[in-house]
Design a protein with these regions (language model features):
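Membrane-interface helix termini and inter-helical loops of multi-pass transporters
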Residues: 72-80, 143-152, 180-181, 210-221
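Alpha-helical transmembrane segments
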Residues: 3-21, 80-97, 148-165, 219-234
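Alpha-helical transmembrane segments and their immediate juxtamembrane interface regions
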Residues: 89-112, 164-186, 230-236
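Membrane-interface helix-loop-helix junctions at boundaries between adjacent transmembrane segments
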Residues: 76-91, 99-129, 145-153
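Hydrophobic alpha-helical transmembrane segments in multi-pass integral membrane proteins
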Residues: 65-68, 131-142, 195-212
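Membrane-interface helix-loop junction between the first two transmembrane segments
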Residues: 23-47, 176
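Membrane-interface segments at loop-to-transmembrane junctions
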Residues: 40-55, 113-128, 180-195
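Intrinsically disordered, low-complexity segments enriched in Gly and acidic/Ser/Thr residues
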Residues: 198, 203-236
Length: 236
């Protein structure tokens, strides 16, 4: 009976946290994309703007991917586990949004959300942004697992992963013959799908490189770099 009650309480806190995260996203979105603040706080109608729908639901999917891999430690009781889970979930959420903002600042610095999504309804831009958000979630999921509930290790690996992902986005123009900025402005889906496949492939490679015990950070960082260099050799 006690075990059943604990599961019910955990599920209640999980649902509550998920709802709070979805509500908080509206305000966090306005914080990161200041020109769109007034439109974000209004009611959302998916059928009115397909680009905005892709942009939003890719981020929701990213949150789901990360939350799906969070673990709950019941060693100190149900209430401490629930409190720890909520704190961890909130931290993960804001790290995720911050990561998206940083990576978009590197790859999409020539574009503005309000101009491309709200005004032009640029589906190519929304697709690139959405697939990039999912790629960030894939990498962060591996980071949180490698950190093993250690904040110190998390805040060492997190910037390291962003640097790797940022370098990856900058290298796209060297491995692709397509004009990224020009084709995004024209709304060409070819560049969106090409970049999406590229960033997803690299996100899986980077995530796989972090799947190891991170107790010795110097050896761990060297091991990650070695894995990535080996991946470059076999990556087409």
């Amino acid at each position: 009976m006690t075990e059943l009650l604990d599961k019910i309480i955990i599920r209640f806190f999980f649902i509550l946290l998920t709802c709070l995260v979805l509500m908080a996203y509206r305000y966090a979105h306005g914080l990161f994309y200041t020109p769109s603040r007034s439109s974000t706080l209004r009611r959302f109608f998916p059928t009115n703007n397909a680009s905005d729908t892709i942009h939003l639901f890719a981020r929701i999917l990213g949150v789901v991917i990360i939350f799906h891999n969070l673990t709950i430690n019941m060693a100190y009781g149900i209430w401490w586990a629930s409190f720890n889970f909520c704190c961890e979930g909130i931290l993960v959420f804001f790290l995720y949004l911050g990561s998206i903002y940083i990576i978009e600042g590197i790859s999409l610095y020539d574009f503005e959300y309000s101009a491309e999504i709200t005004e032009r309804k640029n589906f190519a831009y929304a697709t690139v942004s959405g697939m990039q958000a999912i790629a960030v979630a894939i990498v962060l999921t591996s980071i949180f697992k490698a950190a093993q509930h250690s904040l110190t290790l998390l805040f060492i690996l997190w910037p390291f992963s962003l640097v790797l992902l940022g370098i990856t986005t900058k290298l796209f123009k060297y491995v692709s013959q397509l004009s990224f900025a020009k084709m995004i402005i024209q709304g060409k889906m070819a560049i969106a799908l090409s970049y999406g496949g590229y960033i997803w492939g690299w996100s899986f490679l980077i995530a796989a490189a972090f799947r190891n015990n991170g107790s010795a950070i110097q050896w761990y960082a060297g091991h990650i770099i070695l894995r990535l260099l080996l991946s470059i050799i076999i990556f087409p």
